[in-house]
Amino acid sequence: MRSFARISVLGLSLALAQPLLAQTQSVKIIGLVELSGTGATSGTNFNDGAKLAVKEINAAGGILGHKVEYTASDTQSQPQVAKALAVRAIDDGAYVVMGPVFSGSIMVSMVETRRAEIPNFTGGEAAAITQQGNPYIFRTSLTQSTAMPKVARYLDNLKAKTVAIIYTNNDFGKGGRDIFMKALEPHGIKVLADISTDPGQVDFSGAVLKAKQANADALFVYTNEEEAARTLRELRKQGYDKPIVGETVLTSQKVIELAGDAANGAVAHVGLTADAPDPGIRAFASKFEKEYNYKPDHNGLKGYTGMYIVKAVTERVGKFDPKAFADAMHGVRLSAKEYPGILMDVTFDKNGDLDRESFMTKVVNGKQAVIATLPSLSAGK
């Protein structure tokens, strides 16, 4: 009888504990981000955006009543370190992995998350990322294949017949350069100088001199942030006076800070910008700056919206099932009206590429200004 009583009391105690247990359960989302090395600017922005989203999500009750437990590991901007950290994230029971941002790193690390069937969001823009048949990889930004035709169209509108190219010789730079050159073909724009530079390169005098000597109608610059700023400073130093056009990085906040007045006049297509004429994005930028004491760039938006996409799709699925989540991501359409945290309406295709509005921007008086809002490719379909 006493045993029965003890069992009954134990059973009642466990039953009463269930609501508390449910409240304290958490779901692990692990970031693999560039917090040091050449990608520190990108990775820190991405990570801070993700952390801000997690703070808000948890304050609002979490995801399906579960608190988000987000931790980030530093890839040191090294692909092999990223790969090792991906294995650790799998061992630690990650539901979703966020990052890396650099294309070269995600190309290596996503092999591990794919093998473990864990959804993986990346800030990388190289087209090759989503061309590997990986059903668990998803972007937080437009692919180069979507962005470069918009840059080529802008050059065509400038009546440019020739162009010089300065690009970084890494997965990001080479991939973008290749797609950009293809995007020029329908417009009949010829490449007069194809100039490769190294990641982390400091001296751009030779590259800029080659671009000047080519005497093309415009210059396309496609490098990472620090290199872009150095290129702009050298261009102004050598008196370059033709249009300077880029994609995403060239007019980013970090480049403007590093290049100073040399950034003025630069034009770039961007998939995301804190300066977009959108109340939701402006509110995000204000919250981010208040939280971290610096202005976010496109990578901050990637981390923030990526985390909210995880929340939205998980809640549609109704459970924490990585495979079901990945299946639901393919072909999903999410509206900012229904899910404000995603900031902009977005769709994902079968490859994990996303589509949404984007922007043409220009640096004016040391600030990025939006000069045009471009529709998503799926608009009107």
Predicted regions located by residue number:
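Sec/Tat signal peptide C-region and signal peptidase I cleavage site
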Residues: 16-22
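Extracytosolic ligand-binding ectodomains
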Residues: 2-7, 11, 22-381
